[in-house]
Amino acid sequence: MASLGGLQNVSGINFLIKEGPKVNAKFELKPPPYPLNGLEPVMSQQTLEFHWGKHHKTYVENLKKQVVGTELDGKSLEEIIVTSYNKGDILPAFNNAAQVWNHDFFWECMKPGGGGKPSGELLELIERDFGSFVKFLDEFKAAAATQFGSGWAWLAYRARKFDGENVANPPSPDEDNKLVVLKSPNAVNPLVWGGYYPLLTIDVWEHAYYLDFQNRRPDYISVFMDKLVSWDAVSSRLEQAKALITSA
């Protein structure tokens, strides 16, 4: 799994970033950390070929066209996301920038032979904050299943109280320093809310599952959690998030 380390402050928001890339001539479509047939038979090679090879690729190509020669040219992907979200008054580059980030993150959430149950501190926090691993699964699956239309469901670590500076219709604030389940419409991700460190996501746009599951989104969600999630990746992100919070 690629490193998700690093700390960047954009408009007062601290969050995990990937080291590079910038949106410039060197910004290219990043492949998943496994072959396109590596998730079979759970997720088909055909799904990866269309989802990564066409949808994700198009987001990258469109983003490069949108930012070249603008004030966003040369900024990091995360800076572009927060700036172009524009407190909910979304600017043209936002959707493609956020979808590039979301998909890079999503591919790293999965691995061949994934699923099962996490261990260590991650499991302890899940049991503390949700009551049990089963209750967490129920809440995450419900968030993903009930996201109307296109969007994403997330497990995130909330590091501080929500300040509302850069989001329209935010999730309700609650106590700090805990795991939370969120859902977001279209391309929106927790980076724009401030104080949320994404740990896990599932893509519930129809193109993510329709070739394999048709309209059976709940079945796709269950298979994702049971057979695809890389809990090692989620645990690593939790460790890095807590280290960043401590050093901020």
From Swiss-Prot:
Cofactor comment: Binds 1 Fe cation per subunit.
Subcellular location(s) per record: Plastid, Chloroplast
Binding site for Fe cation: H51, H103, D203, H207
Reaction(s) the record says it catalyses: 2 superoxide + 2 H(+) = H2O2 + O2
Recorded GO CC terms: chloroplast nucleoid
Domain of life, per lineage: Eukaryota
EC number(s) stated in the UniProt entry for this protein: 1.15.1.1
Role noted for this protein: Destroys superoxide anion radicals which are normally produced within the cells and which are toxic to biological systems.
Subunit comment: Homodimer.
Protein name (record): Superoxide dismutase [Fe], chloroplastic
Species of origin: Glycine max
